[in-house]
A protein has these predicted regions:
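Sec-dependent signal peptide recognition
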Residues: 2-8
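C-terminal motif of bacterial Sec signal peptides marking the signal peptidase cleavage site
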Residues: 14-15
Length: 335
């Protein structure tokens, strides 16, 4: 029967993350022996965060997920769901709109609602939404995306229906295991599509970001994390602007910087403050997590795990990553 002969093809047909490398690579151990995670720490003193790259839906993925009754993404996270579930906070970049029908891939994304449900069911409990595709379906697409995310009670940052909503919900304050994390999110642009008032997209503007950082500090968080949609697509090294912004963000008080947009993996740094000895994680680009991209080095990305611990202070105790690979959709062959 064709369904048994092509079981493996069917499992890979959604162009989803298929496997992570068996061996976890420790970022901290590579750069500093002083940050091993060997100390005994009670669970309430520890916060485990997971960051993954771009969640996308190209036309091949949408077509592959179509069923007679809708869209099925249930196999999308089969091989990584357990890893996602280990995190207290699992954070991803939603780089599509949920703008409703017609569902389309590149260049103006609108994914089926079932894609968001699968993301939620996989264990992602925080989304960032400010990216160059935030306005692919204009005002209605931005608002519908936010409304659907809110309907699943997923905290999110980056785009807002109006100023009142942004003032109330931003910076995004995440409280877990006795920790308070302020999450910021910005994009370099929206592919030339202007935002329609009263909607708001968080663009990279240092004047605005500086104000947001000060507002973050006012709520006395244990850490401020900035998710930046920046850089040049398909480039494996950060550009001057990324480096400048990373330096500037940390100088202004951001503890850790997580990047996306290039669709390929870029370097990771752990910086040590020469005065306080604090450790700052900078990930220039996580690469892709779910996509149908075929350009060189775009068929995968990183899952970066960060462990914060709290005793007399809050510190970055351990950090490691896994590589992930995405399989492109394959058509079933009838025999």
């Amino acid at each position: 029967m064709k369904h048994s002969l092509f079981l493996m093809i069917l499992l890979l047909s959604l162009s989803c993350t298929s496997r992570s490398q068996a061996k976890r690579d420790s970022i901290i151990d590579t750069l500093s022996d002083s940050l091993s995670a060997t100390d005994s720490i009670s669970p309430t003193d520890t916060l485990r965060l997971l960051f993954v790259g771009d969640l996308m839906q190209h036309q091949g993925q949408i077509n592959a997920a179509r069923t007679s009754t809708g869209y099925d993404y249930s196999t999308c996270f089969t091989y990584v769901k357990e890893e996602i579930g280990r995190a207290d906070l699992a954070i991803a970049n939603l780089e599509v709109t949920l703008g409703g029908k017609p569902y389309k891939g590149y260049p103006a994304f609108s994914a089926p609602d079932e894609f968001l449900t699968a993301i939620h069911d996989a264990g992602f409990n925080v989304l960032v939404t400010a990216n160059n595709h935030s306005l692919d379906r204009g005002k209605s697409g931005l608002e519908r995306t936010i409304q659907l995310i809110d309907s699943l009670k997923i905290p999110h940052a980056g785009t807002y229906i109006n100023t009142e909503e942004r003032d109330k919900k931003y910076p995004l304050l995440l409280e877990k295991n006795g920790f308070r994390i302020a999450l910021l999110n910005y994009t370099y642009g929206t592919n030339g599509i202007p935002v329609t008032p009263p909607n708001i997209v968080n663009y990279i503007d240092t004047t605005v970001i500086a104000k947001d950082i000060e507002e973050s500090k006012a709520v006395k968080p244990d850490a401020i994390i900035a998710c930046m949609h920046w850089g040049i697509e398909y480039q494996s090294l950060p550009d001057k602007e990324q480096k400048f912004l990373a330096d500037w963000l940390i100088q202004k008080g951001v503890n850790h910087v997580i990047g996306s947009h290039p669709h390929v993996v870029q370097p990771i740094e752990v910086r040590t403050d020469s005065v306080t000895n604090d450790k700052h994680l900078v990930v220039y680009s996580l690469g892709n997590y779910i996509s149908n991209m075929s350009a060189r080095r775009t068929d995968g990305g990183l899952m970066v795990r960060m462990e914060l611990v709290k005793d007399s202070t809050v510190r970055l105790n351990n950090c490691e990553y896994s590589l992930v690979w995405t399989a492109r959709p394959l058509s079933l062959i009838h025999i």
